[in-house]
Every structure is written in C-alpha cells, then in structure tokens.
C-alpha cells in the first residue's frame, strides 16, 4: 500500500522537521524579479558628509556631473540624513530612462568629484541583487590561489628552424592547421572536427585562431592550439580584431538577451547587437545597437538596408576607435575606457564613409601626436561633394577638397599612410555616362598637396596600392550595354611615379593591358609582385603574375618611371574564388570555395612567379587562411644589413634546399631498399616452408620439374599408393556463329 499522511508515524513527522530540505537553489532559479520600475535608479557613494543646510548646495554641484550623461533634477535626488542631521555620504538618483542610468554607471563610476572624493556609481538593482541576505558571506574567506601553470608560448611557430609558415584549412566540418613544406605535402599540426560552426579567422598578427559558434567566439593558440579566451555573444555572425590584437568586435543580427546567471554579459548588453571586448581580460568594454546602411539611391522604392561592417574602425595605434551614423556623424571613442572623445560626436551632414590612416603619420611641420581620419560627403543642394582629412584627437580639419558631379567615392590609404587615393566616380551633366578620376593626397608633404589623375576614360572597378610602396594598379571597364549577355571587357593599368632625383614625382601611366576579363588585384605583402586575376566568374579563370621591378632590359618608353613591368606567367584555375599571398611573399594560393560554387573545389599552391607547385582538389573545401606574421623585430639598419648580405644568405639557403632534397631522395631509396629486403626475406621464408613440406611428403627437392614430378608419381604408384588424377575444364572463350 502506498504511504499516506494517515499512515505516517509521529517519528516520521519529527524526522521531516529535523532534516529540512534545502530549496535555496530552486528559490534562486524561480525567484520573482522585482526590478520593474527600479532600473532608472542609481546609488552614488563616496560623497562628502555635509550638514543639512549644505545638502542642497551639494546636490546642485552633483547635478552638473549627472546631467552630462542623462537627465535628472533636484527632486529626483534623495540624500538621507542621520540622527545628527548629517548626510551619510551617499545618494539615490532617478534618471528618466534605464539607458541614462546605465550611462551614469559606465561613465561616472570611478570619476573624481573633487580632489578628496571619488564617485562610486552602481545601479540600485545591482545592490539589491548582490547585497540581498544570503548572497554575500559575512565571514571573510581568503580566495583560493590556484597552483602556477606555465602558459603556452603563443608565438612558438615563429621559432621553426626552417622558418616555415603555417596555414589553416577549413573543409567540411573539419579545420586543420598545417606547415607549408614547399614542394612536399603539408605537415599536419592539428586537425579537429566541428572546430567552428561558421568560419575560422586568424588575428592580425597570427597569435590567435578564432572559431565562431552560436554561443560566441573562442580564441585558440599555442603549440597545441589550446583554448585561450572565450567571448559569449549569442548567435554571433561577424567578428573583427583591432590591428594590435588588443580588442575584438563581435556582431549579431539578433539583439542580445541576457540570461539570469550569466557571469560576463550584464544588463548593459541587453538589446544590443555589437560588443567591443578587451582580449586580455575577456570582458566587454562597451556594447552598441547596430546602424544599418542604405544600399543605394531609393528611387520610388524603399532603399535596401545592409550591415555596416566593420561597424567600428580602429586607429593604427589602437588609441581610438570610431563608428559612423550615416548622413549624420562620426563618433570617436578613446581606449581602453571607451569614452566618447570630447564627450560629443563629430557632426558631419551627409557623411557617407570614413577610413583611418593604417599607420601613424608625421606630417611635415607638425610636431604633436596625431592620428589621421579621412571622410567624404555627397553633394547636398547647391553644396559640392567634399573629401576632408581630420586630425585626432584635436578633431581639426587639416585638408579639404571639393568635388562636383559625384556619383560615388572610395577612399584608399597606402599602407604606410603616405598617400590616400580618393577614387571619384563622376557622371556627365546629362547623367548618361560615367568616368573616374583619382585625387591623390600626398599626406607627408607640406600642406598635403593633391595630385589629380584624370586621364582615365572608363569607370575604375578595382584599385590597389603597392604595400610599403608608391605604385598602384587599377582595373577599368566600359559601360555595360543594356540586354547584353556578356559583360564588357576590362583593362588593367599600371601606374608609377616619375623619377625625380630624391623626391617622388607625379604618378604616370606605365602601361595598359586591354581586352581582359580581370576584376581583382592581389599585391604581394612585400610589394614588387602582383597577381591580376579573374575571380567569381563562370567563363574566365586567368591569373596574371606581374613583376614591377624586372631585372631585364627596360623599354625605352618607360625609362623615366620608377618601375620595370614584366608579365612572368599566366595560368588558369577553374572556378577560382580567392587568392592569398603568404606573409613572406614567396607563395600564392588560389582556391575555389564551396561557399561560392560546388564545382572542382580545392586549392592550388604557386610560387610568386606563377609556377604551380601542387594541386589539391578537396571535397567541400571552404577556406584557406595563411597564418599572419607579426612585424619584424629587426631595426631598419639591421634589415638593410640583411638585404646587403642577401646573396650570401641565398647560398646557404640553396645548400639547405639541396640537402633537404638529398634527404628526401635518401628516404625514398631507403624505403625502396627496405621493401626489397622484406620481399627477399619473404621469398626465402616461403622456400624454406616449401622444402619442409616436400620432406614431409617424400618429394625430392627437384619436384618442381614436370618430368621429375611424373617419375615421382609413377614410383609412388608402384609402391602401392593410390594416385587420384583430377581433370579441371575451364572455358576460355565462347563464340556463336550463325550458318546459312
């Protein structure tokens, strides 16, 4: 019979009272939230203790600080008094919105009120949540100190004796990291299934490999690629590292919903799309709602929206990060506190895009520190379009350029910040035809002069500066004919400055290659060599390998240019979608990703001169990612010395290559010898077993001879033994013939 209340003994009732069941975990899980209506309140501690008659004066002084981050009033500030009519050193403040309360905590916590007092600002519900009875142990317990564990060397791959580079391969549900072995098959470092759910991405200096999951982002590193950091951002879709790997930006289309008990994300991230993280601590610095961009002119229909990415753009030294609210402003934040520079955004009517200089530039005649930012605005009413260069942190406009009949503008900084090319697409007055001209700002020269390249007759569809150089390549195309099934041909143009003593002359056209299908430009990270290719095409797959400093004879017409152009080789890779140079500029990988099409996916390895080293068809191939290298630690003088002795080093490298080939050949010969010896040993062993069987059956050693075997059979029969002869018929061939 099942037990009931009536059948319980008195002892059972008392045992239930003595051993009370602990429901604390269930209470915490299903606790009713009482935060509604109190999320606009903050508690400010660290205030001066003043008498009642000075309280209003202190409140008015405090309001100056509070109203910089939100809106409140004297009536919304409550400062309690004790029995002696003295304030207690804290106050309760109500803001108009929860967002203002969050801003007060973020921006005012830890800021000085005066020389002797520092504000400590917390949300009221945080104090209620964490200070509730039972949440904090009244008795101090020293934290447990974990035993020291030596961390892995995050740049161990740079110590490879052969100075090899690594790359990551993403195919199917597997991601692997491999050593590049030139002509030989790559050497596996690690290969894991389900390492990432979306994509993999290296950090800019190669320290971390990022994997992206529905729960957030994880960073991996060290010789064994162990987990280094994780950043919880539900349904994250895009990530971006800062140039020095100090910060990480994550984005999701879904607003964040912070779950109860989440240890890293707080109410500040609730409803946001973007988080800026500190990689060293793994903590969020600040979160934001994303801004959409309009995809183009609206016309009669509602303009399409697209994601603004990267949402935040970093200065070269990571001291500043900026985001744009299209058509309105640029907001510049100071790191690491993520405070708005000057407490206000830069209002720019109509702003369409901006770009930081990729390097810290020293302009002629300017001694103070600055970072440069370039932006452009379209034509508004009778006002012309404008390109401007701003100095940060002063926010001073140091150069402007007015433009007319502008359809679109693209900003291209040279890698050292020496130039910024403004690619201007202009329409005719009738707006029936388009053409492009280039406005090149010479940033390091006094006054930032602008050089105009207006010799282009068609529209530029691609432009790329030489890394650490002063040459560039561009691709132009004519206007597409309405209804035409074939896209118009393209032309590839190479530009270089004129020779002008020690100075850099004007940019001049070296050569134009007509009637091409090329649409992409890939410079070697070391400059000089460039691949001009056709990617994402269904009909053309050519890759042209060019040398801008060919050591052969120079054409007479190009003797005044700081370049000697030479086509080294043209190859094809069917279905090519991506081209990637290794960090040293020695190897190029072309790949065909399943993310674009499903025909002949895989990757091919080439030298800088276009010689194909290997072809690697790979089922469900997705990504090929060279591991970046950090900047060299050698000084400019040491680098100069290395270049000077390069021929001597080359002899050593050639000797090492020959030795490696000899070792490889020796390994092949040794393997063949080993296989031959194993075969000879097997033959010997089989012969010995055969001889033992012959002895057992009384067969002579020469029984393999047919004549001797026949005589042996006759002898056996004479001795009275029975010999069974088996005849086996085997049909060799059948044919059917019809007669008559």
UniProtKB/Swiss-Prot annotation:
UniProt keyword RNA-binding, yes or no: yes
GO terms of biological process kind: formation of cytoplasmic translation initiation complex
WD repeat residues: 193-230, 232-289, 302-343, 455-496, 513-556, 571-609
Record GO terms (molecular function): identical protein binding; RNA binding; translation initiation factor activity; translation initiation factor binding
SS bond partners: none
CDD domains found in the cross-reference section: RRM_eIF3B
A GO CC term attached to the entry: eukaryotic 48S preinitiation complex
Annotated region (Disordered), positions in chain: 1-20, 695-721
Keyword RNA-binding included in the entry's annotation: yes
RRM domain sequence ranges: 40-126
Annotated coiled-coil segments of the chain: none
Keywords on record: Cytoplasm, Initiation factor, Protein biosynthesis, Repeat, RNA-binding, WD repeat
Subcellular locations according to the entry: Cytoplasm
Compositionally biased spans, kind Polar residues: 1-10
Function: RNA-binding component of the eukaryotic translation initiation factor 3 (eIF-3) complex, which is involved in protein synthesis of a specialized repertoire of mRNAs and, together with other initiation factors, stimulates binding of mRNA and methionyl-tRNAi to the 40S ribosome. The eIF-3 complex specifically targets and initiates translation of a subset of mRNAs involved in cell proliferation.
Descriptive protein name: Eukaryotic translation initiation factor 3 subunit B
Lineage, opening ranks: Eukaryota, Fungi, Dikarya, Ascomycota, Pezizomycotina
């Amino acid at each position: 019979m099942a037990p009931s209340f009536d059948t319980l003994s008195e002892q059972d009732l008392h045992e239930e009272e003595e051993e009370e069941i602990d429901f604390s975990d269930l209470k915490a899980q299903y606790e009713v939230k009482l935060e509604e209506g109190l999320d606009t309140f903050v508690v400010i501690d660290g205030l001066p203790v003043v008498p009642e008659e000075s309280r209003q004066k202190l409140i008015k002084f405090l309001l100056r600080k509070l109203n910089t981050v939100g809106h409140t009033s004297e009536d919304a500030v409550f400062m309690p008094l004790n029995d002696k009519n003295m304030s207690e050193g804290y106050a309760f403040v109500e803001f108009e919105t929860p967002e203002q309360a969050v801003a007060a905590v973020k921006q005012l916590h830890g800021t000085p009120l005066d020389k002797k007092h520092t504000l400590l600002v917390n949300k009221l519900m945080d104090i209620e949540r964490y200070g509730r009875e039972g949440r904090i142990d009244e008795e101090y317990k020293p934290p447990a100190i974990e035993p020291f564990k030596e961390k892995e060397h995050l740049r161990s791959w740079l110590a490879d004796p052969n100075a090899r580079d690594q790359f990551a391969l993403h195919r199917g549900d597997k991601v692997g990291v491999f050593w590049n072995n030139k002509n030989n098959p790559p050497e596996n470092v690690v290969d894991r299934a389900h390492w990432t759910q979306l994509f993999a991405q290296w950090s800019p200096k190669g320290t971390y490999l990022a994997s992206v999951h529905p729960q957030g982002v994880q960073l991996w590193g060290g010789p064994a690629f162990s987990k280094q950091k994780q950043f919880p951002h539900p349904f994250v879709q895009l990530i971006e590292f800062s140039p020095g790997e100090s910060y990480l930006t994550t984005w999701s289309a879904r607003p964040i919903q912070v779950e109860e008990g989440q240890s890293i994300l707080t109410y500040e991230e609730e409803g946001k799309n973007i988080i800026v993280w500190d990689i060293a601590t793994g903590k969020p610095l600040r979160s934001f709602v994303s801004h959409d961009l309009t995809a183009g002119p609206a016309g009669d229909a509602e303009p399409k929206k697209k994601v603004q990415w990267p949402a935040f753009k970093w200065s070269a030294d990571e001291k500043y990060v900026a985001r744009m609210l299209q058509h309105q402003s640029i907001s510049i934040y100071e790191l690491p506190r993520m405070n708005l520079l000057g407490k206000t955004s830069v209002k720019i009517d109509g702003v369409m895009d901006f770009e930081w200089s990729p390097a810290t530039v020293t302009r002629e005649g300017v001694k103070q520190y600055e970072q440069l930012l370039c932006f452009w605005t379209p034509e508004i009413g009778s006002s012309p379009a404008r390109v401007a260069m701003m100095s940060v942190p002063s926010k001073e406009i140091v150069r402007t350029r007015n433009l007319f009949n502008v359809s679109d503008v693209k900003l291209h900084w040279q890698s050292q910040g020496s130039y910024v090319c403004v690619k201007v697409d202009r329409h005719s007055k009738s707006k029936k035809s388009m053409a492009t001209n280039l406005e090149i700002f010479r940033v390091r020269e006094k006054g930032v002069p602008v050089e105009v390249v207006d010799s282009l007759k068609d529209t530029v569809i691609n432009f790329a500066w030489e890394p650490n150089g002063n040459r560039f390549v561009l691709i132009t195309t004519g206007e597409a004919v309405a209804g035409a099934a074939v896209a118009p041909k393209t032309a590839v143009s190479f530009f270089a400055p004129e020779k002008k003593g020690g100075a850099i002359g004007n940019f001049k056209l070296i050569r134009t290659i007509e009637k091409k299908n090329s649409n992409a430009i890939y410079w070697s990270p070391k400059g000089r060599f460039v691949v001009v290719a056709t990617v994402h095409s269904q009909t053309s797959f050519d890759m042209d390998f060019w040398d801008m400093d060919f050591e052969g004879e120079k054409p007479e017409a190009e003797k005044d240019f700081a370049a000697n152009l030479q086509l080294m080789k043209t190859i094809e890779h069917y279905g090519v979608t991506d081209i990637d140079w290794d960090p040293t500029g020695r190897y190029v990988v072309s790949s065909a990703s399943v993310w674009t099409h499903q025909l002949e996916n895989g990757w091919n390895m080439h030298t800088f001169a276009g010689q194909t080293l290997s072809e690697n068809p790979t089922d469900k191939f997705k990504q090929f990612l060279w591991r970046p290298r950090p900047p060299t630690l050698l000084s400019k003088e040491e680098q100069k010395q290395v270049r000077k002795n390069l021929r001597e080093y080359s002899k050593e490298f050639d000797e090492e290559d020959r030795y490696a080939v000899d070792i490889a050949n020796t390994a092949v010969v040794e393997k063949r010898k080993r296989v031959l010896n194993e075969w000879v040993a097997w033959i010997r062993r089989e012969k010995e077993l055969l001889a033992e069987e012959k002895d057992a059956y009384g067969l002579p050693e020469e029984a393999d001879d047919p004549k001797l075997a026949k005589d042996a059979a006759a002898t056996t029969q004479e001795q009275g033994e029975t010999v069974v002869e088996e005849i086996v018929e085997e049909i060799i061939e059948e044919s059917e013939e019809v007669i008559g």
